[in-house]
Amino acid sequence: VKYFFDTDHLYATLLVFAAVLGIVFVPLNIAFISPFAQAFADFDITDLVFSRLRSDRSTTSDTSIVLVNIAHLPRHHIARQLERLAAHEPAAIGIDAFFRSPKQPSADSALAHALAKARHVVLVSKLTHFQPSDGVFDSLETSHPMFNRFAQNGFANVVVDSLAGFRTVRSFSPCERVRTHASVNEHLAFSVQLARYLDSNAVKRFLDRQNEVESINYRGNYSHFYTLDANDVLDSTTDLGFVRGKIVLMGFLGYSLAEPSLEDTFFTPLNERSAGKTLPDMYGLVIHANIVSMILQGMFINDMPVPLSMLLAFLVCYANMVLFHYLIEHYERLYQPLSIVVQLTEWVVLIFLLVWLLDQWSYKADFTLTLTACTLSAGVFEIYSQSLKPIVITFRERWQERQSKRSNDNITTVTTTVVHSQNIPTSQSTGEPL
C-alpha cells in the first residue's frame, strides 16, 4: 500500500503521457524508417481476427443477399438484367453504378423503363465537398434525373485509410448531413437504405446506436453470398426465382467472375497480407453486401470509447510505476531483466485481449495508448528516478519551507494581536455603559 499512494508515481506517469504527446506531435522524417513506416502504416492487429481466425472457421453464408455482376455491360443489357430480376419480386434492388449522362437514346430509354417498372430500387450517390466547420457535405452527386427519379438514393462513400497509398475499408458512416439548396437534410448510406426494405426494425436498432462511424463486421468475400455472373442473369434459361424476398445488389465484380479486375477494389481486414499489402482483395459491391448483412443480422462491433481507453492507459501506466518502484527497492540487481519481462508480458496479454474481445464478443478495444505507455514506462521511470526526482524533492522542500515560514509569520501576528487586545475595555454583562 505504501508504494501505491506515492506522488512520485503520479509525476512519472504524467511524464510518460507528456512523452507520448511529444511522439505524436513532433514530425519524424527519417529516411531509413520510411520504407518500414509505409509497410506498416495501414497495419491493424485486429485485422488478424478476420484474415486468420475467422477465415480458418467456416463462416456461414448469408442467403438473404444476392450479388449480380454487371461487368461493363451496355445500358440496355443492364436494363434486361433489371427486368428479369424485378419480375421475381426481390425485397429491394441496389445498383452500385452511376448513369451520369445520356448516351444512346434507345439504351437509355430501356434502362429508364426498367427502373420505372421495378420496385424498391436504390441507386448510389456520392457525397462531396465536406465542410469540417459544420460537419456538412455541400454536394450530392447522383445519376442523371431520367434514371434517378425512379429510385431512392444512398451514398456509397466509405471511410478509407489512405496512408501508404492503401485504401483499407474498416468502417463506414451510416448517415450524413447534406446541404441541398437552403436546407440541410440527412442522407442514409447505400447499404442502410437497402436494408430498410427487408427489415426496418433491424435498421432502426442499428441507427439508434447513434454512432457517427461504425466498424464493419465482415462476413467474407463474395463466396459468402449468392453470386450471379452477368451472363447468368441475361440467360433466359437461368431460374431466378430464388431472389424473391431477398436483397439484390448489382454492380461491378470484374469483367466476369472468372476474370477479376482491380477496378473498384479495396483493401479490407480480410486481406491475407496484413502488412505491406500488395493487391486489394474486395470489390466495393461486396463491401456493401457485408454491411447489409451486418445490419440485418444485428452483428455489430462495439468500439471502446476514447475516455475509457485513456483511463485504462493511465491506470496500467501508474501500476507499472508502482511495480518498478517495488522491484528496484527489493530486487535492484534483477531490475533490468524483470522490467523487460513485465513489459513483454503486458504486450502479450493486451494483444491477446484485443484479439479475443473482437473475435468472441465483437468488441473492438483500443489499447494503442496503453501499449505505448507500457513501452515507455520503464525508461521514463528510470529517467525520473535518477534525474528528475532530486529536482522534484528540492522544489518540494523549498515549497514546504516557504509554507512553514508563512505559517510562522501568521502565528506571530495573531499572538501580538491577542496580547494588545487585553488592554481594551469590554462591555459588562448587565449592558451598562462603560
Give the location of each predicted region.
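General structural signal for secondary-structure boundaries
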Residues: 44, 226-229, 283, 305, ...
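Alpha-helical transmembrane segments forming the membrane-embedded cores
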Residues: 309, 330-434
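Active-site Gly/Thr loop motif
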Residues: 208-227, 286
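Intrinsically disordered/low-complexity terminal segments and short unstructured peptides
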Residues: 141-142, 155-157, 161-163, 167, ...
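Short clusters of hydrophobic/aromatic residues that line enzyme substrate/ligand-binding pockets
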Residues: 216, 233, 270
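Non-transmembrane functional regions of envelope-associated proteins
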Residues: 2-206, 243-338, 342-350, 376-377, ...
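Low-complexity, intrinsically disordered short peptide segments enriched in small/polar/basic residues
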Residues: 89, 213, 230, 415-416, ...
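A Trp-anchored, charged/polar loop motif used as the substrate-binding/catalytic surface
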Residues: 224-241
